[in-house]
Swiss-Prot record:
Residues 9-240 form the ATP-grasp domain. This is Succinate--CoA ligase [ADP-forming] subunit beta. Disulfide bonds: none annotated. The gene is sucC. It comes from Aquifex aeolicus (strain VF5). The keyword Nucleotide-binding applies. Its EC number is 6.2.1.5. Its cofactor is Mg(2+). Belongs to the succinate/malate CoA ligase beta subunit family.
Amino acid sequence: MKLHEHQAKEIFAKYGIPVPEGKVAFSLKEAKEVAEELGEFPLVVKAQIHCGGRGKAGGVKIVKDMDELEKAVESLLGKVLKTFQCPDGKPVNRVLIEKATNIDKEYYLAITLDRSKSKPVIMASAAGGMEIEEIVKENPEAIIIETIDPELGLMPYQARELAFKLNLPVKEFASIALKLYQIYSDLDASLVEINPLVLTKEGNLIALDAKLDIDDNALFRHKDLEEMEDETQLPQLEVEAKKYGLNYIKLNGNIGCMVNGAGLAMATMDIIKLAGGEPANFLDVGGGANVEQIANAFRILMADPDVKAVFINIFGGILRVDRLAQGLIEASKMVELRVPIVARLEGTNVEEGKRMLQESGLNFIIAEDMWDGAKKAVEIANKQS
């Protein structure tokens, strides 16, 4: 789950990480009130969306007076902001108004999980700001990476070593780095990022931007954070799927996937790619896969206009395949299936399950195995496109 910049900065401030003075506004009236409260110009107006690249897309504006502030806010609120990271755009429903910072140099600082090591890492660079992606592509060595022992946490000597390498005030930088790790640990974050961390001309370090992503699997421990989620930033199909209790993530392909089990769902997407296709989603219906759950999954898949074919990949372990087939038949009668359905079934009573689907009179195409199913789904999707 992603938080907005202003939400992340509020958390940073509680932990003692310096952030610019500012406040969020949901309307022009509120923006003017915030400007008056801050009491001086120049101010910075920042669109709040769950996407990077705002600066290059005109989502961050420096204003010198109230007239410029009004124009900036009106140009952002209620609009869709498209960035290179989000070409389809995200709606801007709030803006952050902050005091401008006297920047001397920009840096990068983040903590995330290195899945190859199964350990968190802290990453820092003397090259921060809007160009960080390009800099890392051209010169990966520009990023300094330190592995963190999860049993010990980020050690003070590691934070000091980073400060020395970046030629930054040691005490101040180490304090920020250690507090950033505390946030990462306390909130079960998957990513905490400051880009840029700026050194001001007065010699202070300030988190000019803030990014905080929370592990969805840990949200049961953080109900206060879960309530902060802005669903307007999510694909509406994901919001709908969440109501049904489905694990669904929208992707950019044209082959809808319905699978039981997260591991099999990942393998299904891989084999679709291997067959030359593009998955339209990740969708794990869970181990139960009852009629209602399957019907809801069909509703989500059929609501996606990009979907040209559906690949159902089910392994019946505890769940008998004949019962699952009956569930598929009943669910398909509840939802209009506008595209062909390729089904690969395996497990207990699989032959009976296949026979039931073939005799149902519905638009099911039976696959012999995963590879056969993936090839059939790709072929159908290409014909439908």
